Amino acid sequence: MNRIRFISLILNLDSCDSNIQEYSRLAYVHDLNKLMDENFVSLLLIILKLAKNSKRLQPTYHNVYLFNLLKSYALSEIDGYVLGHFSRGFVNTLMHYKNAQYETLESLLSANNFFEANKFTQQILLELAGEQSKQRNWMYFTDVHSINHQSVSDLNHLWELYSQGNFGFSIQKRIWISVNKNWKKFWKKIGWINSNSKWLKYPGEFMWAVNAPPGHLPLFNQLRGVYVLEFIFDYYL
């Protein structure tokens, strides 16, 4: 497969390949590392521009990966284009998120700074839940009703995209359902408790990398009860 065909396939610009599944495309994307050189980077930038101009560029796992791969090459042409057209972040630019804090969150996730991204996510949720939640720095189970559905969906979307589908509330919900909503099994499955059913110590014993167990992040304090997270699973996703 030649390089133009390869990238067009990944970006879903070729309609005859539109039925290829997301993870199949992602497998192709990872193979790009074997082809990368300065000429190929320039070609990738051209196709990115074409995709954005045609309004066919979508915030998907593979496109997020490609965009980050492109940014990793310190070329003035790339830096100029990214600054001029994606200054709010790749996903924020395409999705037109209204909450400016999501730009900061996307920047942290894009840099694989999952520790700070987790803290910032909790901060956003507390602010969305209301001033009292923010002041006390945790939520009562009644506070979660103040958070609107779209905000949770947007947060979840960013986590999913920048972890290639490994993190996010929707991933956690899927695992929770897979263990018949048994919380202890859920916590063990996502790596919040150890084999002796003891809670991991924050922050040192948790994993802050994309290869952590599925659903490991973002963290949610379960010592105050499961209602808030259960409410998010049941009503927001």
Swiss-Prot record:
Pfam families: GUN4. SUPFAM superfamilies: GUN4-like. CDD domains: GUN4. GO terms for molecular function: tetrapyrrole binding. Keywords: Chloroplast, Plastid. It is found in: Plastid, Chloroplast. It comes from the Eukaryota. The keyword Transport does not apply. Gene3D superfamilies: 1.25.40.620, Gun4-like. Its main location: plastid. The keyword 4Fe-4S does not apply. This is Uncharacterized protein ycf53. It comes from Cyanidium caldarium (Red alga).
